[in-house]
Curated annotation (Swiss-Prot):
NCBIfam families given in the database record: hisS (TIGR00442)
SUPFAM superfamilies for the chain: Class II aaRS ABD-related, Class II aaRS and biotin synthetases
InterPro entries listed in its UniProt record: aa-tRNA-synth_II (IPR006195), aa-tRNA-synth_II/BPL/LPL (IPR045864), Anticodon-bd (IPR004154), Anticodon-bd_dom_sf (IPR036621), His-tRNA-ligase (IPR015807), HisRS-like_core (IPR041715), HisRS/HisZ (IPR004516), HisRS_anticodon (IPR033656)
A GO MF term: ATP binding
PROSITE patterns assigned: AA_TRNA_LIGASE_II
GO biological process: histidyl-tRNA aminoacylation
One GO cellular component term noted in the UniProt record for this chain: cytoplasm
Species, as recorded: Haemophilus influenzae (strain PittEE)
Keyword Iron carried by entry: no
Family of this protein: Belongs to the class-II aminoacyl-tRNA synthetase family.
Identification of the protein by name: Histidine--tRNA ligase
Alphabetized HAMAP family for the sequence: His_tRNA_synth
């Protein structure tokens, strides 16, 4: 026997028993985003490597350690580690953002070479939103309101907490960076080699360290909010006022900076403790300089992304009664001379007239006992049964697989009306 080939570590299959929940969550995402007037876009999975180096930042962990990169002739290419850079590239390339606002969303797989753990994988899926052309904090508030509406649709709104911060302008961050480095230089004895490297290359990333001793020290570190420029401070205060007005609760987290270099002003995360240690479900913020940085005109921009694997785990944990639709509603079984064509015609009739129902036709042979065993295993609500006598009399036997009504025989012309009463 040939040796079997396994999936790559950190890149997982989604089983037939798991996909209905994924489909339900994705449907809620699509419904909420479309209801706000946002438009779906689809970008390539592979992009030019310099796109991410320029957008995300050379010294970030994502670019320096986690990207899947390869050469194609003389061009260096990368499996996308996130969606914003590719969406900005597409918006510039196709002229989507000029002379009007654009509110876009996307969904799909991303790739990062990091240590696989619960809710964090090397191939993972994100739904993301990017908005171009709106500078005022109203759109910041709308994105947060949009995510909150989605959490309610998913039944997880009581298990997530909104954390907010403003990281200000480039100049404000430069001033804060100097103050933070001056403070941290006296505590290098507590730092790992990686943290010492961050102190030199990207000191703001130390703010979200997992080192407990360093976390205690950072409680007394300079606060970024104290270094904000007037414009960023006013923007942040207006955002907080809007959230207060609509009743969305939040925590101001002065250590929240996000892991990518393109952010400015507003940054936010929705976090949960329902999966054990606190983890991020959704995060985003403003990136007003990124479009210009990637070759476009200066364009105010904001966006967020949410991890679908995390959402799946969270929904499974806190909302076990999700109304997930079965993969099969109706199972057609048949046996005897002349029944095959009749069964095919019946299955197609149901699919044509009741397209919202999932109808499976038994195709692997066997007697009725074996076929009913398959029907039960499928999770279907009804079995439609055709034998030789049903073909002759133009009838169908209906069996309720989940209990309830007794088995009954109906004329073929009445079968659609009857099925409609059962769903």
């Amino acid at each position: 026997m040939a040796k079997t080939i396994q999936a790559i570590r950190g890149m997982n299959d989604c089983a037939p028993t798991e996909s209905p929940l994924w489909q339900w969550i994705e449907a809620q995402v699509r419904n909420v985003l479309n209801s706000y007037g946002y438009s779906e876009v689809r970008m390539p999975i592979v992009e030019s490597t310099p796109l991410f180096a320029r957008a995300i930042g050379e010294v970030t962990d994502v670019v320096s350690k986690e990207m899947y990169t390869f050469w194609d002739n003389d061009e260096q290419l990368t499996l996308r580690p996130e969606g914003t850079a590719g969406c900005v590239r597409a918006a510039i390339e196709h002229g989507w953002i000029y002379n009007n606002e654009q509110r876009l969303w996307y969904i799909g797989p991303m790739f990062r070479h990091e240590r696989p753990q619960k809710g964090r994988y090397r191939q993972f899926h994100q739904a993301g939103v990017e908005v171009f052309g709106i500078a005022n904090p109203k759109i910041d508030a709308e994105l947060i309101m949009l995510t909150y509406r989605l959490w309610k649709a998913l039944g997880i709104d009581q298990y997530v907490t909104l954390q907010l911060n403003s990281i200000g302008s480039l100049e404000a961050r430069a001033n804060y960076r100097s103050a933070l480095v001056g403070f941290l230089e006296n505590h290098q004895d507590l730092m790992s080699d990686e943290e010492k490297d961050r102190l030199v290359k990207n000191p703001l990333r130390i703010l979200d360290t997992k080192n407990p001793e360093l976390q205690k020290v950072l409680d007394n570190a300079p606060k970024l909010l104290d270094y904000l420029d007037d414009e960023s401070r006013e923007h942040f205060e207006q955002l907080c006022s809007l959230l207060d007005a609509v009743g969305i609760q939040y925590e101001i987290n002065p250590k929240l900076v996000r892991g990518l270099d393109y952010y400015n002003k507003t940054v936010f995360e929705w976090v949960t403790s329902a999966l054990g240690a606190q983890g991020t479900v959704c995060g985003g913020g403003r990136y007003d300089g990124l479009v210009e940085q990637l070759g476009g005109h200066a364009t105010p921009s904001i966006g967020f992304a949410m991890g679908l694997e995390r959402l799946v785990l969270l929904v499974q944990e806190v909302n076990p009664n999700v109304p997930v639709k079965s993969a099969v509603d109706i199972y057609v079984v048949y046996q005897g001379e002349g029944t095959t064509l009749a069964a095919f015609e019946l299955a197609e009739k149901v699919r044509s007239e009741l397209p919202h129902l999932n109808t499976m036709l038994h195709c692997s042979g066997g007697n009725f006992k074996k076929q009913f065993k398959r029907a039960d295993k499928s999770g279907a609500t009804l079995a439609l049964v055709i034998g030789e006598s049903e073909v002759q009399n133009k009838q169908v036997v209906v069996k309720h697989l989940q209990g309830g009504a007794d088995q009954q025989t109906l004329d073929l012309v009445n079968i659609i009306d009857y099925i409609q009463t059962q769903f």
